[in-house]
A protein has these predicted regions:
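Outer-membrane beta-barrel signature, preferentially recognizing the C-terminal barrel domain
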Residues: 190-193, 313-341
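N-terminal periplasmic/intermembrane-space "pro-region" immediately following the signal or transit peptide
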Residues: 3-66, 77, 81-83, 284-292, ...
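Signature for the C-terminal beta-barrel architecture of outer-membrane proteins
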Residues: 16-20, 125-129, 147-302, 336, ...
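Extracytoplasmic loops and strand-loop junctions of Gram-negative outer membrane beta-barrel proteins
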Residues: 27-31, 57-62, 101-103, 141-144, ...
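Surface-exposed loop and membrane-interface regions of Gram-negative outer-membrane beta-barrel proteins
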Residues: 55-72, 82-126, 138-149, 222-224, ...
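Outer-membrane beta-barrel "beta-signal"
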Residues: 19-20, 423-447
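Structural signature of outer-membrane beta-barrel domains
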Residues: 52-56, 85, 95-97, 136-138, ...
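C-terminal beta-signal and adjacent terminal beta-strands/loops
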Residues: 13, 396-423, 436-442
Length: 447
């Protein structure tokens, strides 16, 4: 939501995406460096502190069921560099939802002092092999990302191999980590998420291209006919983003899915396109962006076939509005964004979304792929999910402390109102984030 464009990372490590897109609401501001000779030259400590006050008017679409609570998150990490070819990193997480009854605490809100990351990075020139608990995030993070906005951001256990820098190839075999609020976080049995992601950063001027293929597999699922079996879904696709002379920018993704879900076959697809224009010379440096999103839904024309797109492991915050009510499954969206820069350290975003289901015979899904509204056998009477208006702002108070504020208002459409989800919802938030690192004076930076 800052100035339009893309930023290529300079160092290859497991936390890095090949390309960071400005529309993902990541953390802005710098990491404060605090030199201390008491820390060995081969080690660096890093800390991130974040608190976010949230309030909403009608939790679970129940009128009058308002909630206000404080989400706190602390990361503490330690990087060690015992040799020229080996780096180790471990990071703890401690998150809480203060003021919220446990019955309302979601799985992504609370994790009492746990291990978030722990990996070894064997590296030589532009080659890396990373083993352990690590982050995965690619492109706009619409299919694979850490979901940093949530209190418990996502990590994976497994292996990642990387060769190259601005033009590179990543290959990984992992299993997503399941958060257990009061015990150690674990992953499922076996490695269940695999992928290969290429990054083409210099072949086409002013453009980054990421072809990818992801494979999601589970040993036991139940089909639409109630038959148990294995799941294997392959998701090939490509994402591209770039700047066009004259102040224009774009970002687009297309993905297809084929595979099996027990005895059912999977045939699904999804994509989005964004196109924007920024006037650097005008007052407030306005940037106008148009966006269209589509993810297929089950048509029920063939009861042995599943057409619902599997959203994989996305960063869904603000993908379909600030209220984060819906996911990238059985959905269509038209959106208009207006970014403004009233001051050097302040950005403002205004946006309007219109949401519909792709198929009236499939459910309406949440950001975590759960069911918000279950479609009756005869299908939903309307495809209108609703519309939302959002206003948000970021203020870098200084180089190291960043404030985020925002409010989103969702107005349910006929598909929601006719199925017991008719209460409008307003959500507001205010957050502060501070990051710093401690290391021996003159030594290498931490992650």
């Amino acid at each position: 939501m800052l100035a339009a464009g893309l930023v290529f990372t300079r160092t290859a490590r497991s936390q890095d995406s090949a390309v960071h897109y400005i529309d993902y609401p990541g953390t802005v501001g710098k990491v404060q460096s605090l030199p201390w000779d008491g820390v060995p030259k081969w080690a660096t400590l890093d800390v991130q502190l974040r608190g976010r006050l949230e309030g909403q008017s009608s939790d679970n679409f129940i009128s009058g069921n308002g909630r206000a609570y404080l989400l706190t998150r602390n990361y503490v990490g330690l990087q060690v560099r015992p040799t020229k070819f080996l780096t180790g990193y471990i990071q703890s997480i401690d998150t809480h939802a203060l003021g919220l009854p446990l019955t309302y605490v979601a799985a992504n809100m609370r994790d009492t002092f746990d291990d978030r990351q722990a990996y070894l990075d064997f590296h030589m020139k532009n080659m890396h092999v990373i083993a352990g608990r690590q982050e995965l995030k690619y492109g706009g993070e619409r299919l694979v990302g850490i979901s940093d906005w949530t209190n418990n951001s996502r990590t994976w256990d497994g292996f990642l191999g990387r060769i190259g820098d601005k033009n590179r190839l990543d290959v990984f075999s992992t299993s997503v980590v399941a958060v257990h609020p009061t015990s150690l976080d674990t992953h499922g049995a076996g490695l269940t998420f695999h992928g290969a992601v290429g990054t083409i950063g210099t072949w086409v001027p002013h453009m980054a291209i990421q072809p990818f293929v992801y494979i999601k597999s589970f040993p036991r699922v139940q089909s639409q006919q109630g038959i148990f079996g294995t799941e294997t879904i392959t998701t090939p696709g490509v994402e591209a983003a770039g700047n066009i002379p004259g102040g224009f920018d774009f970002d687009g993704l297309i993905a297809f899915q084929r595979g099996n879900y027990s005895n059912d076959s999977v045939v699904a697809y999804a994509g989005y396109i964004k196109a924007g224009y920024t006037s650097q010379a005008a007052f407030l440096k306005p940037r106008l962006l148009g966006e269209y999103d589509y993810a297929s839904g089950n048509t029920r024309k063939d009861l042995t076939k599943i057409n619902t797109f599997d959203q994989q492991y996305p960063s869904n915050h603000n993908a379909f509005g600030l209220t984060d009510l819906f996911g990238f499954q059985n959905i269509k969206q038209e959106r208009i964004n207006l970014d403004l820069t009233p001051a050097k350290r302040v950005t403002v975003l205004l946006q309007q979304e219109w949401l519909q289901v792709a198929s009236r015979f499939d459910n309406i899904y949440s950001g975590s792929a759960g069911t918000v509204v279950k479609a009756p056998t005869t299908g939903l009477l309307s495809d209108d999910i609703g519309r939302e208006f959002d206003a948000s702002a970021k203020w870098a108070i200084n180089d190291y402390v960043v404030m985020n504020v925002g409010v989103g208002h969702f107005s349910p459409g006929a598909a929601m109102r006719e199925n017991g989800h008719g209460a409008p919802l307003t959500l507001g938030y205010m957050s502060l984030t501070y990051r710093f690192k401690v290391g021996h004076k003159g030594t290498a930076s931490a992650p």
